[in-house]
């Protein structure tokens, strides 16, 4: 795999982007990776490589660049948890959308990134960004995957799940049955809306906890394997077909 980290210009200042893609010139279809709350840790980088092995140009932006460039959670102590949640709650979806716009403006400068239909995948708070992206840029992003989603079903009038019924691309949402942080039972509306799509699928994975899709302490092999199996089918259909 070829990996690179760049600093690009965003409306809010310098912003890091990290790319994992196959060796060679490409161009390869683009999959935008929205990392989870703990930041772009080693488990996330390994997960990006897993997707890139399917033949994709996988790129993520530094979600927390306004506060702490390339933050990656260190341990699970109270202070670190407080810091991480502060970053999660302190970064708005409007800011993420602004960052995505900067990323999309930069992509044509890399000849390895293919133009045309794109996919996106997100974890935890990143799954919320997936739903907001298919809402705002559904014509460009033809496949979306959200694993162990956070803050996707709320009582607010702009709750991300409300965008699902109008999406015409492929969407996969995966929950863990053991997830008490963001349980599937709190996301019934999202599950029902996803399963009602022509090309949508929501699943609850038995025994999997929050974080099951990222290599690390909460990784759940069976749930991850099933989720990535479905993700690959959707990406291949929408981006390579």
Give residue ranges: language-model regions.
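N-terminal cap/leader regions of alpha/beta-hydrolase-fold enzymes
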Residues: 1-241
